[in-house]
Curated annotation (Swiss-Prot):
Class of this enzyme: transferase
CDD domains linked: Cis_IPPS (cd00475)
InterPro entries: UPP_synth-like, UPP_synth-like_CS, UPP_synth-like_sf
Taxonomic placement: Bacteria, Bacillati, Actinomycetota, Actinomycetes, Bifidobacteriales
Family membership: Belongs to the UPP synthase family.
UniProt name for this protein: Isoprenyl transferase
Amino acid sequence: MSMAFENVDYTSLDIPAAPFSDPARIPDFPKNKVPRHIGVIMDGNGRWAKQRGMVRTNGHQAAEPVVFDTIAGAIEAGVRYLSLYTFSTENWKRSPQEVRFLMGFSREIIHRRVEQMDEWGVRVRWSGRRPKLWKSVIDELEAAEERTKNNKVIDVVFCINYGGRAEIADACAAIAREVRDGKISGDRVTEKMIADHLYNPDIPDCDLVIRTSGEQRTSNFLPWEAAYAELDFVPELFPDCGRDVLWRSIDHYIHRDRRFGGVK
């Protein structure tokens, strides 16, 4: 299946800026107020391409350098975890041609960029379901996870074939199997137990979710982990984003009053 697009040009439309190239530009955020975990819904690639008379796949290509500029900006700001909504379980509804491109492009990006991420101290993580996902994509993700497993600067989670409801359903199914096998009691299921069965239970809850393109919905992204996250809906299409947009959202977050249901 993955061989169908072997002759497709998967190169990006631009070259990303290197991290730490201009330290004077980095905002001086209070270290104790920077969100520990940020999730980004990378939306608007297709519209960006359409506005320029290009095909949708060109929008995805234009997004590649922005992804890594965003990662660089997160490192500079002191963010510890960054989850990127790369391909959802609902994205299989797109045209077969676009799905094939996205699968091949995801595989090639991980393969092409893993050395760079390793040099930056990125620990690559993957969150999502295995069924339907190309084996070649899984192989690249697992190889990148293995190569970078000891890195500690930032964990970057590529959410590929990910759906929040699917993640919760999978966690409940795993708990049900443990109940069936007599490992736990069915009447003692807790929130912590569900959290412990999510795809990456060691990653803390999401503090800030950013969605690009002006759309104001979360689209099944981290519903459990982002239950108390601050939301920032930015107008820019994703290929027009980068570290400056990320920093602006972090600044918005820092100036919000988080109460978690309580009163101050």
